[in-house]
């Protein structure tokens, strides 16, 4: 197996009407232990190049946040997994809450674990994103440097570098990109010549519902990035909790 992507049942939130179900344990400690036993088996069948992505939310009990994701994260590392990233899934459309005495939570954790820190597969190019428009416009401006005071020399305002030096720098960039000084941002992105950057570790992805489907489905956008970056072409992805989405 090349990769695991899953979202296990959250602690003490839903009753799936199954005997011995995960998520209905008496304590958080027992819940985390049962979860880790599942991922012990994933670790066993995963290739040395493999990754394991786990989305898990937290639970309140008697006005206390139980810190389920943090407990799970530490327990996984104690059992031989290596944590590469902790992604924040920020939801612009979170579920309403009835509580009147706390902030409205709109995020969940998405952990990226690897089996071997020296061998894991990662395709960085698959998840590069375009630079922001304001950053791109700096490359095409005649002189975009902010005026700033040089407190080491005097109180006079000046440029960090000369406009001539900056023009030459950006001229080289434009030449390498094969783009004229006048440009349209949308057209630049379509051309495939837009400068890129690595994806951030906070992802703004709306939650979704599908008529007739499982009531806790993945937004396709949420798992697209992990699969594109961590699973080789024609690779095998497993979800031990049989999630749909």
Question: Where are the language model's segments positioned?
Answer:
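Core catalytic lobe of class I
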Residues: 1-245
